[in-house]
Structure formats: C-alpha cells, structure tokens
C-alpha cells in the first residue's frame, strides 16, 4: 500500500516544506534542512510535530502522511528509532484526545510498511494501546490467526511475542470482548515451555480468575493442560480451578468456608460462584442420568423446592443442558448435556457414535444399490 505524500517534490524539498509548516504553527524548529541527512531531518520533524496535531484532521493527516512517506524511504536500520518515536507521540498525545485521528495515522503507517518489516510490531502495539484507550478495539485487526501470522512474519523474540499477546489481551478485556480475550490469554499461556512457565505465574493466575468470573464461561478443563497453570499446582488458585473443572457444589462450599478471604481477594463474588457451580453440578448430573428427581436436585444443588423450575429454565438458556420438566412426576428429563471435561472416555464415546453412523450409512448405501439393481 502506498502512502500519499504531502507534496510531489524531492525528499529534501519535502522535508523543508514540513519544517516551514511546523515552524508556522509555532514549533521550535529551523526551516533549514540538517546537514546530517534525511533521517536527522525526520528526527527533528517528529520531535516538533505535536503542534500540528491540534489542526483539522485532514491537515494533520496530510502532514503525517508526508512524514510517513519519508520514513519509508529510509533504510530499515534508520527507520526503527524514528518510527518508535512517532508512535510514542501518537500514543501519548494530550492524554487521549482525538483517538480516531491517531488511530487513522497509525493505521496509515502500519499498512504503508512492508508486511514483513519487524518494526511493524511497534506500530501494531501502538494501535492496540490507542484503540484500548477509547474502546475502539473493533476497528483494528485482532483476529488470532492473523496475529499469529504477524508474529511469525516479524520473527519476534519470545519476550516481544508475550508482550504483544498480553497487551492485546488487556485491550480486549478493557473493551468487554471477553471471548476474544480468553482465546488470546490461552494462546499466551500456551506459548510458554516447561523452562519458562514459572515466569507466567501472574498471567496464569489472571487467566483463571478471568475465566471463573466470566458469566458465559462454563468449561475450564483446557486450562489445566497449560504449562503455566500446571506450575500453580498445590496453590489455592489451582485447587479452586480444579473444583470448577470437575467437582460438585458441595466441594466449592467447603472450599469457600475454609478460604473465604482468598475468594474475596480474587474479586470473585460468592453468590456468582454458587450460581455457576450449581449449573456445573447439574451438567455433571445430566451426563450421568437422563432423569433427575426434584428431591435429588434440591439436595445436590442446595436449592428450595420452589426454585427448581426457575433453575432449570436458566440452565437451558445457557445451552449447556437440554431438558424438560415433568411436574407430575417431579423430575427433569434430560435430552442432552455438555460434558464438563473431554478426556479419553469422551473421545471413545465420540468414536463409537461416529462408527455407528458410518455403519448405518453403509447399510443405507447397500440398500439403495440393491434397489437400483432391481
């Protein structure tokens, strides 16, 4: 993608025009080009460009596109420091004013650069910061497949990869994109190895709390396979996660009674935890039993007789369980329930089901062939 220039003249004259323009707006900058060359001129222009950011959007974009077009002429080794300086200016400008303009300017820079240029990492991180500051994360590309490709294209170090994913996660959380944020955090934690998993303690802890707090998250067994989460084994946070993965409501109640201060310190609300654990317990019951009596539900879920119907309705709304109420016989009839964990047993059940379908389809095929022969 080409970036529009400020004016169709030589690079030296273009730099001089930019200097003159900035000086006319009150910048402390000489109108004469530096003897050090274009990269020195650009360093001084970028340092003084704050004054133009208060002008009309079209004027600012024209000036900044001119700066960008000159930046892209430079050798890659001379670009990096200047691009970092420009990005810092746009991220920090007036404590968040004119976010849409700054997003546009950063986007022009990002898409104007060669797709494999490593310094695009700096520009993309700046885009994330500005978008997060104004709740506009939906206006920049954040698809995980694309981010993975960029990480590969830019040949990022492990540290930069973790920084980018952590920054993206926090931005998505701030912008209320909980599903996307969870996927990014899992990607981040999954990128650690046994050698450096201990460095991700904070991220792993945050991931668990965020998942438990999410009102739309009910399946957590995949978190236990992540190396940074495994590193937390033996700690209360890991014990709590294990309860939400496979234990019943009674186990959570006992844990809460023994660790109330810990639950409160995580920012988790006990009543919300109880509601989620009731659903998770019911899901487990529904997998094992196609019919569940009201009395059993009252005992296992610790609810009153008058609350059973409302609970079932709420459970069905989550689409984790499909069932109907039989008021006459005081029971719930289950048609389907999502497994809380998916291990070897579930894979075997899936294999058996698919194999049965295959055999039935072969029978249908053979029947149709025999009919066609006649």
Swiss-Prot record:
One of its GO terms (molecular function) is translation initiation factor binding. Residues 344-374 are annotated as: Interaction with HSV-1 and HSV-2. The modification Phosphoserine is found at residues 2, 152, 367. The modification N6-acetyllysine is found at residue 254. GO terms for cellular component: cytosol; eukaryotic 43S preinitiation complex; eukaryotic 48S preinitiation complex; eukaryotic translation initiation factor 3 complex; eukaryotic translation initiation factor 3 complex, eIF3m. Keywords: Acetylation, Cytoplasm, Host-virus interaction, Initiation factor, Phosphoprotein, Protein biosynthesis. Changing residue 354 to P: Reduces HSV binding and entry. Disulfide bonds: none annotated. InterPro entries: ARM-type_fold, COPS7/eIF3m, eIF3m, eIF3m_C_helix, PCI_dom, WH_DNA-bd_sf. Induction: By glucose deprivation in neuroblastoma cells. Changing residue 350 to P: Reduces HSV binding and entry. One of its GO terms (biological process) is cytoplasmic translational initiation. The modification N-acetylserine is found at residue 2. The keyword Cytoplasm applies. Broadly expressed. Residues 180-339 form the PCI domain. Coiled coil: none annotated. Component of the eukaryotic translation initiation factor 3 (eIF-3) complex, which is required for several steps in the initiation of protein synthesis. The eIF-3 complex associates with the 40S ribosome and facilitates the recruitment of eIF-1, eIF-1A, eIF-2:GTP:methionyl-tRNAi and eIF-5 to form the 43S pre-initiation complex (43S PIC). The eIF-3 complex stimulates mRNA recruitment to the 43S PIC and scanning of the mRNA for AUG recognition. HAMAP family: eIF3m. Component of the eukaryotic translation initiation factor 3 (eIF-3) complex, which is composed of 13 subunits: EIF3A, EIF3B, EIF3C, EIF3D, EIF3E, EIF3F, EIF3G, EIF3H, EIF3I, EIF3J, EIF3K, EIF3L and EIF3M. The eIF-3 complex appears to include 3 stable modules: module A is composed of EIF3A, EIF3B, EIF3G and EIF3I; module B is composed of EIF3F, EIF3H, and EIF3M; and module C is composed of EIF3C, EIF3D, EIF3E, EIF3K and EIF3L. EIF3C of module C binds EIF3B of module A and EIF3H of module B, thereby linking the three modules. EIF3J is a labile subunit that binds to the eIF-3 complex via EIF3B. PANTHER family: COP9 SIGNALOSOME COMPLEX SUBUNIT 7/DENDRITIC CELL PROTEIN GA17, EUKARYOTIC TRANSLATION INITIATION FACTOR 3 SUBUNIT M. Belongs to the eIF-3 subunit M family. This is Eukaryotic translation initiation factor 3 subunit M. It comes from Homo sapiens (Human). The lineage of its organism: Eukaryota, Metazoa, Chordata, Craniata, Vertebrata. The gene is EIF3M.
């Amino acid at each position: 993608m080409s970036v529009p220039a400020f004016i169709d003249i030589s690079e030296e004259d273009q730099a001089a025009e930019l200097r003159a323009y900035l000086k006319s707006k009150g910048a402390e900058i000489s109108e004469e080009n530096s003897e050090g060359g274009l990269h020195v001129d650009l360093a001084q222009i970028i340092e003084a460009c704050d004054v133009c950011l208060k002008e009309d959007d079209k004027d600012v974009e024209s000036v900044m596109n001119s700066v960008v077009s000159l930046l892209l002429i430079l050798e890659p080794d001379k670009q990096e420091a200047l691009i970092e300086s420009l990005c810092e200016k746009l991220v920090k400008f007036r404590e968040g004013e004119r976010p849409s303009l700054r997003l546009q300017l950063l986007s022009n820079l990002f898409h104007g650069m060669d797709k494999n240029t490593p310094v695009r990492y700096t520009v993309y991180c700046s885009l994330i910061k500005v978008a997060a500051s104004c709740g506009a994360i939906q206006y920049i590309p954040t698809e995980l497949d694309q981010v993975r490709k960029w990480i590969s294209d830019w040949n990022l170090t492990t540290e930069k990869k973790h920084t980018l994913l952590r920054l993206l996660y926090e931005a998505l959380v701030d912008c209320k994109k909980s599903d996307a944020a969870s996927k990014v955090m899992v990607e981040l934690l999954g990128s650690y190895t046994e050698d450096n998993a201990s460095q991700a303690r904070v991220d792993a802890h945050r991931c668990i709390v965020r998942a438990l707090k999410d009102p739309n998250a009910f399946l957590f067994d995949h978190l236990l396979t992540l190396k940074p989460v495994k590193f937390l084994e033996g700690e209360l946070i890991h014990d709590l996660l294990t309860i939400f993965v496979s234990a019943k409501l009674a186990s959570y109640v006992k844990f809460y009674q023994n660790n109330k201060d810990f639950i409160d310190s995580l920012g988790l609300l006990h009543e919300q935890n109880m509601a989620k654990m009731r659903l998770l317990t019911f899901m487990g019951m529904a997998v094992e039993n196609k019919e569940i009596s009201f009395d059993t539900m009252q005992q296992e879920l610790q609810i009153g007789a008058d609350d059973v119907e409302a609970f079932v309705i709420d459970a069905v709304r989550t689409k984790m369980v499909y069932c109907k109420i039989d008021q006459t016989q005081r029971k719930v009839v289950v048609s389907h329930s999502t497994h809380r964990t998916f291990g070897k047993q579930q894979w075997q059940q899936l294999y058996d089901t698919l194999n049965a379908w295959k055999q039935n389809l072969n029978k249908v095929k053979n029947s149709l062939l025999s009919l066609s022969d006649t």
